[in-house]
Amino acid sequence: MSEDFYDVLGVSRNADGDDIKQAYRKKAAKYHPDVSDDPNAEEKFKKIKKAKEVLTDGEKRQMYDQLGHDRFQQAEKRGGVGGGGNSSGGSARGDPFGGMGGQGSPFGDIFEQFFGGGQGQRRQGNRPRQGQNLQTRVQLDLEEVYTGVEKQFTVRRPEKCPDCNGRGHPSDADVRTCPQCNGQGQTTTVRETALGRVQQTQTCPRCDGSGEMYTQTCSTCNGDGVTRQEATLSVDIPAGIRDGQTLRMEREGAPGDNGGPRGDLLIDVSVRDHPDFERDGDDLYYRLAISFPQAVFGSTVEVPTVNGETTLDISAGTQSGEEFRIRNEGIPHLRGRGTGDLYVQVQIVTPENLSQKQREALEAFAEAGGESVDVSQGFFEKIKSSF
């Protein structure tokens, strides 16, 4: 038997929408593939997302509770599970036993959804509906990623029309019954499935579920009920976030219908390239130029970090391309579980112009090592030609 969605999120069957969302955020933060060390993190994260998708959709959750986990998944594979009209993720799920004349049958809604009939066919278009999610992008510097930042940004989003208050028509416009759904707000279709012939309803596309049509439309919003306006918002971005990750601001998306809540705003994070550092996960890489004497005799050098400087001991006899590790000078791990490291790759710089004294000293050095030195090709030229 597959794992129950309530068990996946670790909530009770009586949990409301806020409890489910809180549990989802906690589980997602723990098992997100980008931050979790669990070898099965990706599979667990998929289960967590699926559980949240079902349990925060009023109609899907009711069907899940009535059918049970295995039968629900079978029905979903056959195409017998539709998306709920209320995706707000809240606990309000309408009348849980509607359409059975007040009898309180636990199977009222599900049989009305599949087979139609009864009071379940009455207009549902006026129910509160959550607004659409919107998407935007913010750009960060590496220094902001290192510290975390409260980022202010501007987004254009739909807002309720100020002239018609979101109605889409003047308050004195004449109203008539929608001819397509006859005022029901829904249209009905019949199709064949693995369960047999089923009857399903959907929101009327002509009146958008209201069951009514108006003789005039608002000239400001052209009947849409919304206008696009700029909004200035700020979001707290945690230290350690990576390029391509997405943040969610709840209830900052498009306005809902019929008093429903706003959708969410999804913020895609983009991190600018840094002129000095390259990032790999939470580790940073830096190329450090040193002189030949520093490489030969060793030296203590200053190395830049994202938030300042630190010192590095170059050991005697260091070779070009050798790498040194400075612990805890990388990027903080997301969710505050330590810090990455800074890797410093040494590049020995060959001087292009030597004084006569420098040349003689290096030639003597080379000869002392048993090399035959051609004056026309000094020691550094040999080094150059070896690369």
From Swiss-Prot:
One of its GO terms (molecular function) is zinc ion binding. Its cofactor is Zn(2+). Zn(2+) 2 binds at C178, C181, C204, C207. Zn(2+) 1 binds at C161, C164, C218, C221. Residues 80-105 have a biased composition (Gly residues). It is found in: Cytoplasm. Binds 2 Zn(2+) ions per monomer. CXXCXGXG motif repeats lie at residues 161-168, 178-185, 204-211, 218-225. GO terms for biological process: chaperone cofactor-dependent protein refolding; DNA replication; protein refolding; response to heat. Disulfide bonds: none annotated. Residues 76-135 are annotated as: Disordered. Keywords: Chaperone, Cytoplasm, DNA replication, Metal-binding, Repeat, Stress response, Zinc, Zinc-finger. SUPFAM superfamilies: Chaperone J-domain (SSF46565), DnaJ/Hsp40 cysteine-rich domain (SSF57938), HSP40/DnaJ peptide-binding domain (SSF49493). Residues 4-68 form the J domain. A zinc finger (CR-type) spans 148-230. One of its GO terms (cellular component) is cytoplasm. It holds the Pfam family DnaJ. Coiled coil: none annotated. Residues 121-133 have a biased composition (Low complexity). Participates actively in the response to hyperosmotic and heat shock by preventing the aggregation of stress-denatured proteins and by disaggregating proteins, also in an autonomous, DnaK-independent fashion. Unfolded proteins bind initially to DnaJ; upon interaction with the DnaJ-bound protein, DnaK hydrolyzes its bound ATP, resulting in the formation of a stable complex. GrpE releases ADP from DnaK; ATP binding to DnaK triggers the release of the substrate protein, thus completing the reaction cycle. Belongs to the DnaJ family. Homodimer. The J domain is necessary and sufficient to stimulate DnaK ATPase activity. Zinc center 1 plays an important role in the autonomous, DnaK-independent chaperone activity of DnaJ. Zinc center 2 is essential for interaction with DnaK and for DnaJ activity. This is Chaperone protein DnaJ. It comes from Haloquadratum walsbyi (strain DSM 16790 / HBSQ001).
